[in-house]
Amino acid sequence: MAGVEQAASFGGHLNGDLDPDDREEGTSSTAEEAAKKKRRKKKKGKGAVSAVQQELDKESGALVDEVAKQLESQALEEKERDDDDEDGDGDADGATGKKKKKKKKKRGPKVQTDPPSVPICDLYPNGVFPKGQECEYPPTQDGRTAAWRTTSEEKKALDQASEEIWNDFREAAEAHRQVRKYVMSWIKPGMTMIEICEKLEDCSRKLIKENGLNAGLAFPTGCSLNNCAAHYTPNAGDTTVLQYDDICKIDFGTHISGRIIDCAFTVTFNPKYDILLTAVKDATNTGIKCAGIDVRLCDVGEAIQEVMESYEVEIDGKTYQVKPIRNLNGHSIGPYRIHAGKTVPIVKGGEATRMEEGEVYAIETFGSTGKGVVHDDMECSHYMKNFDVGHVPIRLPRTKHLLNVINENFGTLAFCRRWLDRLGESKYLMALKNLCDLGIVDPYPPLCDIKGSYTAQFEHTILLRPTCKEVVSRGDDY
């Protein structure tokens, strides 16, 4: 409506000419209106621009925030990836196959695996191995104490001078401890004796890090059963199986640079033998307690017998006094020499020879429900080159070859037929017999008490150090 009325009022001027004054007024008014319109447009334009600018500012602010957040999260992801890469071994970088450089993590000390496979020398990289049980020497016969040895500067210096030797014994002893702990975790009735010995020896070789004559097994694994007291290990083809009622003596040795650990224990499954084992263990510990510098060997034997015979054991309704096996004994140990000359009796009436400073002894006792005497029996499996033998001329080529094999692999340490088989030797029995006949090699057949009797054994290696006595093979087990 308003638009129609406005058009009507201007009707006269639209078709006719305007007066000059009217034209000037019209021109000026139209110019003013045009200027006003321009100003309004500018204002509108400015308002629109400022609104757009504000909108853009808002959007750009949000965008900056979003970008900042993305960068932050990306940085976190990269950090996590780097951490993961440090833990891992580093994967190939896509198709290029390039490996990223990783920061090496510091490795902690090695720990033993299960089953044991890490050599003892790798578990103790500083080369210092765990000591055995250190004991004060027993008082002398006139009642004087030996405590002064532990504080004497002279004795300390002497002890330190032989530290390398003691350390070799300790390394071999730690291997022995770990192997026997492993054996006790799996030995059970139903296993063949060959299976038991080979599993034990394989583990022992790994832990001692077998290296020719520098480190390895000191003698074959004895696994004598029941009335057999010592020196039995199965030959190839032996089908003997361990039974629930068997009493098995596990006697094995390790060495580092010829420093031998000779240590043994008895395994049973039937508790009826418990007292027999207690008697023999007690007798061995008594022998260890009595041993010392300037102690007479016969006095050690007498103390052992007294303790052993104080025990009675009932087996299958029969009562037996536990008897020490009088023709078996402990012995001194030398470098690469399991029996170094001195014997430690386990009954009274032995030699009056004295133990000396710096010597190493295997203190072992055997208890029996039989006669208390052993004899050679069964097929021989243990052999050892005679330590004192000189040059003996050998004519037969096979015998010469076998002696070379023995010299290279065992030297003067004991060995068994299984170990010759393992080296690839065959048809060697005649050559071995020839070496025995010539006195170059000595056979050590199994030693047995009467049939139907039961025998037990415990043994430790002791070091007669200048300052103290160290039961180097002592463990938590015995």
UniProtKB/Swiss-Prot annotation:
A divalent metal cation 1 binds at D251, D262, E459. Glycans are attached at S60. Its main location: cytoplasm. It catalyses: Release of N-terminal amino acids, preferentially methionine, from peptides and arylamides. Keywords: Acetylation, Aminopeptidase, Cytoplasm, Glycoprotein, Hydrolase, Metal-binding, Phosphoprotein, Protease. One of its GO terms (biological process) is regulation of translational initiation. Pfam families: Peptidase_M24 (PF00557). CDD domains: MetAP2. A divalent metal cation 2 binds at D262, H331, E364, E459. InterPro entries: Creatinase/aminopeptidase-like, Met_Aminopeptidase_Type2, Pept_M24, Pept_M24_MAP, Pept_M24A_MAP2, Pept_M24A_MAP2_BS, WH-like_DNA-bd_sf, WH_DNA-bd_sf. Residues 36-46, 97-109 have a biased composition (Basic residues). GO terms for cellular component: cytoplasm; cytosol; plasma membrane. Belongs to the peptidase M24A family. Methionine aminopeptidase eukaryotic type 2 subfamily. This is Methionine aminopeptidase 2. It comes from Mus musculus (Mouse).
